Amino acid sequence: MEKKVICQDIFWSCDGTSFVSVHNDFGIRQYLVPEESNTDKLNRNLLLPFTRFFRNQSIVSCAIDPFYTLYNENSDRLAGDRIVVGGKNFPLQLYSLMDGQCILSYDTMNKINGEYETVYSVKIDVESRVYTGSCRNKVAIYDKSRRDAVWMNQSTKKASKGRQSIISCFEEQPMGGQALSRGSLLCGSYANEMFQVDCRHQRLERLNYTRTVAGGIVQILTSDNGRYVYVVRRNSDAISIYDRRNLQHELNVLRLPFRIHHNSAKLKAYIDTAYGLSMGTPQGTILNWGRDLVEFGGVPSHNSVDDPLITSIPPESEWRTNLGSTIPATVVKNCPGDPELFALSHGGTISLCRFGG
């Protein structure tokens, strides 16, 4: 039986003129945004890749340079058309998006058994540092242009029975949003733990451990003001909200009309600076919680953040995408230059749509 092609993630360029999609057919595709201002008139079947290349093995994790653009006018910066890709039994590698050539391989070898450690999560920050997460809750930090890690640590806490001590994701910020303090970054694990990574310190600090039936953290999203953290878990029908100053206690939850199953297509949530938090559904629609709600953690103005009562907040809006109820809308990401425009994946197909349209 032929395996269905599924989009694993979408990354916009910083200027909104192009975007990259990564698929489970080992392919990495780059798209140009058409010049037509009214995308409703576009034939979505004609949205074809500008460039594409394929690896000879599956892609476990990947991340794009935050300054990625096809039109880099600043020649003093390192080229921004870069993507880092992690796979099994292979080192983490840096590729050029334009020609698909491998530029650099990072040292991810386990010195004890001589095997390459699988990088399950990766992130490039604005200071060209590459963060990697692997098994046994290990985090390493690399300079993007050097193969050897400049910082490495792992948590000594053991996961509970049946849980995986794997760093599954790093914190995601809205494009164009406020930068975090230097060196401070959250990461999550499949054992439902949250850690703080800070290369100024010599250890990985566990800030949160949730005893829940959920199957592990898959996304950590930050509000534009940086005060609230939104945590997406597998086998869950809600997105947890935390105050960044107190990650031990759940503040509120965003209620989902479906459960994020362990073996389902990758349904990803996304926060942008204009429309708040959006997420696709298995029925092909897009759920949205507005910016005002997201920026205040779902706490009404007359309530205190110390109020112990947790509120389950339903979506404020649900948009139709004309995909049909049998086609999931898996990845939804807004264009940084035009927030009403978003790239949407449905199966292995990518289309451009406008909110509310």
UniProtKB/Swiss-Prot annotation:
Q: Which family does it belong to?
A: Belongs to the SWT21 family.
Q: Which UniProt keywords apply?
A: mRNA processing, mRNA splicing, Nucleus
Reply yes or no: does the keyword Nucleus apply. yes
Instruction: For this entry, list what GO says about its biological process.
Output: mRNA processing; RNA splicing
User: What organism is the protein native to?
Assistant: Saccharomyces cerevisiae (strain Lalvin EC1118 / Prise de mousse)
Q: Explain the purpose of this protein.
A: Involved in mRNA splicing. Helps to stabilize the U1 snRNP-5' splice site interaction.
Please indicate if the UniProt record lists Nucleus as a keyword: yes
GO cellular component term of the entry, any: nucleus
Compartments annotated for it: namely:
Nucleus
How does the record describe its quaternary structure? Associates with snRNPs.
Its name, as the record gives it, is: Protein SWT21
Q: Which Gene3D superfamilies match?
A: YVTN repeat-like/Quinoprotein amine dehydrogenase (2.130.10.10)
